[in-house]
Amino acid sequence: MHQFPLNSKRNSNFEGTKRNHNIVKYESRKRRHFFLNSRVGEKKGQSEIKRKIIKDEDKYNIIKDIKKYCECTKKYKRLPTREVTIGNVKIGNYNNIAIQTMTNCDTRNIEECVNQIKKCKDLGADMVRLTVQGVQEAEASYHIKEKLLSENITIPLVADIHFNPKIALMAAEVYEKIRVNPGNFVDGRKKWINKVYKKKEFEEGKLFIKEKFVPLIEKCKRLNRAIRIGTNHGSLSSRILSYYGDTPLGMIESAFEFSDLCIENKFYNIVFSMKASNAYVMIQSYRLLVAKQYERDKNGLIFPMHLGVTEAGFGANGRIKSYLGIGSLLYDGIGDTIRISLTEDPWDELAPCKKLIENLKKRIFYTDKKEEASYSVMKKQNKEGPNYSRDTPNNDNDVTVMKNSLSREIQSCSPEKKEEAIIYKAKENSTVHSDNDVYQTIEHWNSNCLNFEENFRDFNNIVKNRVDKKVKSDVLHEECTVGNVVTVKELEDSLQIFKDLNIELDQNGNLKKGAKTTDIIIIDKFETLTDSAKKTVKKLIEIGLHVLVQHQPQNIDIVKKLKINDSSSSYNNNIIFYTHLENMDNILEYYKDEMQKNNSKGYALILNGKENIKMVEKIKNLDPAPLFLLLRSDTVFEHVLVTRRVNEIIHSLGINVPYIHYVDIHSTYYEDILVNASLYVGTCLIDLMGDGLIINVTNYSSAATNTATVANAQKDEKQQISSRVSLNSFLTLNILQDTRIRLFKTDYIACPSCGRTLFNIQETTKKIMKLTGHLKGVKIAIMGCIVNGIGEMADAHFGYVGSAPKKVDLYYGKEIVERNVPEEEAYDKLIELIKKHNKWQDP
């Protein structure tokens, strides 16, 4: 058995021992004192570093030098990072993407920690993190490790360290990886005063970091440990804040101060992380980190990255936010380990991680290189061979290895190989209906779409398309349009469809549009419209919804009859025909006549993203121009690729027509639906590509949500999903909420809990969400503590933060307004605080 040094003067066995409440209160007071945030002043005549006060919406646009953030945005190439060893797990260098989680019990509770670690290992965790905030926790860690080794459990453990370099040195005796936060490892425990840093003082801070951090580097180097340099948005040191502001650039420069010391001391077993509760900021931070490493990459020193959206929350909300942030980076080949930080039990984080990786394998890319296509097919045929990986790594500079993925990189193969690959594709992907479909799609793509380059997705100044105000006010929502697809049968149940489309009642009991009401609906098989369905359509139009109908002779006749029977202007104008781009001449001729009669607002065109550029260019000269485009990819797994292509084409041609994502989700299980909608659509919207979203879940049944492996925390969400249409609405609105494109409810920053948490975070979060979930645009932080700093609450309007066992501090912005509120009173006090600042609305 391994022996570890113990301090005999302390009782490191937690069982039956209670925390000293006086110590907790003392530490809490100190933390509150250190985390007080104040604006740095300015004095004339001094060489100063000014604190930058930057609005949240501008944080994406302050970066001036992102030229390349990944290997390729058109096809999958894993970022080539150094291989790092963490115990018996290797990450980076095309190794499997490692999955990790974190215990949520007190680290001094040895038995409970061991049980949690064992359960996480059994359910697929590659490593487990524990909080180590003091000497007692560090000493308890020795016993935890001994118990695990006695049962031959060698899963790597990660120590979460804040504030105390001495504790980090102790933890290195036990843990395979030490996570340090540059924002508080050295100079986090200090008074945040109106300090103006001179250049000399700023540089002296680096010497202090060297003094405290190098001993840990030397010890980890000697013991073959790894170090994660984990920066958190909102927890930067006052030095960094004074120079860079609370920005992605500040996060990266803070991390580089630590990594440069590692490199100077020839220690390369390091991992980066750039976490934020805002997926928008998190993605930009990692992209900038990669871009900066490309610039600094003289000796192949691009280090692996751990991905995570911190304080994501629980249930579908937490999953969607994480799938957006983590998935969009993995899609572009960035990331070597992941954690989905949920306000749930540690093991509940593992299944979503697996689902994300599993569904990422289905992404579709295309190639015109014979060796790539042949190699891809070979790997598919030998997917259980010695080189099989659960990931989709890149092998070398010239060969894209799509191991066990649903790639279509097969067009250049011999006829025999191509046929085998097509059969494999058809078996694996339920969205492909025949071998012939796959073959035709491949050929169509190769002839048109392999030559685009991204120039207009400007990473330095990401902005939305400018849309004609008249179109916005008349048809599209001013922020982002919400659409849905309904069938005739669903329209026959008017009460259910009103509920599913989030139509509200006014004080007189009349139907009206609300903050989350659907804006446009597409009626599937409109030609089969029944009398009862017609009545529902009429009511929806009266409320203000727009109805999209496919332009074909039978449907035109039905619409004419409807207009004859009801001559109201809304009925005439709110039905909009759409057709495929190649049929534009027919619809154009029809609409010239209709618009002259003032019978219609316009029309829409649908495209799949594979059209010839010359065909798309015709849109520019159409008169009248289409109101908007519907971008409907052949399968969701290629939607990111075709969106990037279409975005380039319409910008390069100067086409000022908005486009709406129209995505069919053919998955059966709820978790797959969540992943595919969030990942393949959210990745586009997070870059502000697109002006609306229509999600169409095609294989929904009531059993789909009941049989899926979804955590218990999602029971309340399932009650919102009573039908296929309601699921479409739920997905669309939550994706728009988490991309922060269109807010319709309260936004929560909820920590996942750890050994520092001072109350039941899961139950507390549920209760606060139940009380405040209707407050559109309000942001509430629910934190077990604020160990990473008061800025960890990000841009929350209000904060509910643990200060002592069953005691809570309440914040307005970054200002503490009430201390040590008893937990049973804190909910009412929070609502009073919200009302005081005029953010409350009655449900």
Question: Positions of the model-derived regions?
Answer:
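Active-site beta->alpha loop and helix N-cap motifs at the rims of alpha/beta catalytic domains
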Residues: 125-257, 484-640
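Hydrophobic faces of well-ordered beta-strands that scaffold small-molecule active sites
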Residues: 97-103, 128-130, 157-161, 178-180, ...
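N-terminal amphipathic alpha-helix/helix-capping segment at the start of soluble metabolic enzymes
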Residues: 53-101, 366-369, 375-497
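Beta-strand/loop-dominated core regions that host nucleotide or nucleotide-derived cofactor-binding catalytic loops
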Residues: 533, 805-808, 816-839
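Catalytic alpha/beta core domains of metabolic enzymes, predominantly
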Residues: 196-209, 240-388, 394-395, 402-419, ...
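N-terminal chloroplast transit peptides
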Residues: 1-16
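Short, acidic/polar
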Residues: 108-119, 164-168, 322-326, 491-510, ...
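N-terminal organelle-targeting presequences
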Residues: 23-59
